Amino acid sequence: MRKAGSRARAEAEGPHRAMEGGEVTGDRLKADTPDVSFEELLRLQGQGRPKAHKQLVAGNSTRTRSPQQPVCVADKHRPLEMSAKVRVPFLRQVVPISKKVARDPRFDDLSGDYNPEVFDKTYQFLNDIRAKEKQLVKKQLKRHRSGEERDKLQQLLQRMEQQEMAQQERKQQQELRLALKQERRAQAQQGHRPYFLKKSEQRQLALAEKFKELRRSKKLESFLSRKRRRNAGKDRRHLPLSKE
């Protein structure tokens, strides 16, 4: 009687124990096997067939598995991903940045070679503008008889005259070089060997042309007097100091 009572008690408690086990994994079993009833799963567990139960759960889970996401192709321009646990090396490879170089069009090869003759012809209008500015400065200089403003105008007029004289000297040198080039070309056409003047000889010819121009403009005496005073001042620097 005791054995029959214990067996009946076990059969009665069997479903209850299965239900207790189902409280732990019931939600998961329902999610994995939506097509199988919960009572069928408990019956399989109670009959001691865990293998069939696992196969049933595994088969339903494979059917309900969501499709995989498409694999994205990595972009070669993406930022470099590194682990934060990796120690940064002492010498790192830094991406070099191109240095900005200042470009002056006056000295750039893309602007072409400097030709004084072409430059003077292209910017011939600047001489007229300088002449008008010089006349304007002279008029303003007549209005200011004294004071700081007159000194500034006097210095400006002197600088403009010096620039004009320097431009005339450059023009004379260009004309002299052009004449020498034409003379050498004529000698080559006649069958003679062309003679190239030295720089010292070119300076002497330029000085002779300058003296001729000063004589024509009646400024030779003033030029020679200034040159004498300049040379005298240079000689005084080299003289020994007088002892008193």
From Swiss-Prot:
Annotated stretches, region: Disordered: 1-74, 219-244
Modified residues (Phosphoserine): S61, S66
GO cellular component labels: nucleolus
Extent of motif Nuclear localization signal: 226-229
Biased composition (Basic residues): 225-244
Record's subcellular location: Nucleus, Nucleolus
Residue ranges the record marks as coiled coil: 141-190
A biological-process GO annotation: rRNA processing
Top-rank taxon, per record: Eukaryota
Positions with biased composition (Polar residues): 58-69
InterPro entries in UniProt: RRP36
Compositional bias annotation for Basic and acidic residues: 8-33
Record's keyword terms, sorted: Coiled coil, Nucleus, Phosphoprotein, Ribosome biogenesis, rRNA processing
Statement: the UniProt record of this protein carries the keyword Hydrolase: no
Protein family (similarity comment): Belongs to the RRP36 family.
Function comment: Involved in the early processing steps of the pre-rRNA in the maturation pathway leading to the 18S rRNA.
Protein name: Ribosomal RNA processing protein 36 homolog
